Amino acid sequence: MPDLKLHQDTLPDGICYIEAEGYLDAHTFEEMEALIAAVFRQGCYKLIVRLEKLDYISSAGAGVFVGAISRAKDNGGDIVFLKPSPQVKEVFDLLGLSAIFQFAETRDEAEACF
């Protein structure tokens, strides 16, 4: 079963950076959900999520971000996706989520969204 690898770091200006690699689906979404919950508990609500190495995302995986964006925005933050792979971006488009989330091609562009 494909897995999910996550890396988290804190950038200047209180921005949290998460890099996801592998598969974000019904079997792995709880890992991402737990990481975002931990970041929120630390008071970080500005998230850049790099999806360049994410091979697959299901509706359950995308649902993690749908559930988190309201809390982020309610606390003065947001979620910005950095360099989503074409197949991942297509899932966001098909689910109608591209209108809700911001996407960036460079880290500077992503940081400027805040």
Please describe what each predicted stretch is.
Residues Q102-T106:
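Short acidic-hydrophobic, aromatic-tinged amphipathic segments that line or gate anion-handling sites
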Residues Y23-I100:
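Amphipathic alpha-helical interaction surfaces in cytosolic regulatory modules
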Residues P86, D108-E109:
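Acidic phosphotransfer microenvironment of two-component signaling modules
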Residues P2-A34:
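STAS-typified acidic loop motif
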Residues P12-D13, E52, D108:
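Conserved catalytic submotifs in the C-terminal HATPase_c
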Residues M1-D3, T10-L11, L54-Y56, D74:
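Short acidic/polar alpha-helix capping motifs at helix-coil junctions
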